[in-house]
Amino acid sequence: MDEYEAQLLVVEQALLVTTDEQQREELSALRTNLEELLALTRSSETEATNNISTAQTNGDLDDELKRFQSELNDLKEQEQEETDTTDDKQQLEELRAKYNALLGEKCSAPHEHSWGALSYHNALICGVDDELIIDGNGILDVRLRVLFTNPTHREMLPCNYYLEGECRFDEIRCRFSHGALVPGASIKEYNAPDFHKLARNCPVLAKLQDRLWHRGRVLCVNFVEQQCRVRLDGQEHKERERDFPFEELFPLIADEDDELSSDSSESHSTEDSDAANDSDMDDLEAARQARMVELSLFTFKPTEKLGAWEQYTRGIGSKLMANMGYIHGTGLGSDGRGIVTPVSAQILPQGRSLDACMELREAANGDKNYFSVERKLKRAQRRQQAANEKAYARESKRTDVFAFLNGSVLGQAQNSTKTTKTSNLQQHSNKTLNVETVRIADDIRRKQRDIAKVQQSLARNATDAQLQKRLNGQLRAHQQELATLQAQESSLSKEQQTRKSKNKMFAF
């Protein structure tokens, strides 16, 4: 528009200067066109300005309307939130009031094991959590804190220090339970123990010294004294058969085997087609295998694998057992509660009675190889016998006056003995003979004292035949040695007397 005005100004100046009529007409026509163009331009700008102002006015109104609507929506949402919060608080208070009335009550609460299995156990409600939860159906609920009364695993065992309020660890760091949080909707009625249904082979839970409840089976029941003898499952217990009072037992009346059998009977009665029956049987078999696998987690894990000897064979035994439905790691039998460790053959000592074998087993004091006691005794006896033989051989090689006297007195050939005796005794001096005489006299007195002690022992133990036999043997040995010593003393005295008489004969 400024350009048009500048052009109009130039045209007007040219009209003032130009005198030519033709040029003035052209310039006049050009001025008229420029004026019309300027007028049109000004009118279009005015309309555009009006439109812009109108649009701005309409935009401001729309924005104001939007802000007003958003404020209304915010107010509605705030009111809804306040209403929901009020409803949640009211519902939370109602749930708390409902569950606070159950504090201290017994119930049956679920417990999820570390391997994913879920089972119900008797528990005691000890608290209500402050937070609301939403279950799978979208319903608000509250979690309850429960303590299990029959814990079967360490993570279920209540902490004694927590119960007394003195535990220094929090719920995560403590090895024992500070209470399990379970949804209130999952709580069931308390399963009270019925001791009247206790019978032989009835499954029970028994409380041991570790405060855990172990599975076992009833052997016999005494309802008068309220005691029950139970055989504990597994082989980690040294004493598998124990007596428990009723307070330390919990009967397991509803067994899983009965549930599986009832489910199978119902499925057979309700299903008509063979395909449906087959599918039900497959489900039951899968459930049985799952239960067997779960049961294997509770059983004792032996160090020796069942069927480990088949590494030297073709393994036909394990293949046959697998075809019959055996699952490795579980016990024998249809319910998987049989033995897990294979029975090993025990070689008894030859020529020994069963009573002697039992005595050896008691002497071993729980040793696996209790016949090692007998081997140790025999080994010590052989060592002692070998030592005695070596000592006897060493003593037999020694040659002294006593050996000479024994040979001279106890020899078989009398003539040769007398000749040797006289010749050998004549080789010793009088001093040596006197010393030997004193030694033999001391040995004779010592043997006489030993014989007197043995005779006193015989008189004191006249009723014990075995001891009498042994003492009589000792007495005979002492008497024989005494006779030998007396014979040696007699020989020495004769030699000394001979020498004295010779000295008298040569004395003038």
From Swiss-Prot:
Give the organism the record lists.
Answer: Drosophila grimshawi (Hawaiian fruit fly)
For this UniProt record, give its keywords in alphabetical order, as a comma-separated list: DNA-binding, Metal-binding, Nucleus, Repressor, Transcription, Transcription regulation, Zinc, Zinc-finger
What Gene Ontology terms describe what this protein does at the molecular function level?
Answer: DNA-binding transcription repressor activity, RNA polymerase II-specific; RNA polymerase II cis-regulatory region sequence-specific DNA binding; zinc ion binding
Q: What is the protein name for this chain?
A: Zinc finger CCCH-type with G patch domain-containing protein
Give the compositionally biased regions (Basic residues): 499-508
Q: Which PANTHER family match?
A: ZINC FINGER CCCH-TYPE WITH G PATCH DOMAIN-CONTAINING PROTEIN
Tell me which PROSITE patterns the record gives.
Answer: G_PATCH (PS50174), ZF_C3H1 (PS50103)
Location(s) in or outside the cell: Nucleus
Sequence ranges of Polar residues compositional bias: 486-495
Lineage of origin: Eukaryota, Metazoa, Ecdysozoa, Arthropoda, Hexapoda
Q: List the disulfide bonds.
A: none
Please list the residue ranges annotated as the G-patch domain. 313-359
Q: Where is this region: Disordered?
A: 258-279, 486-508
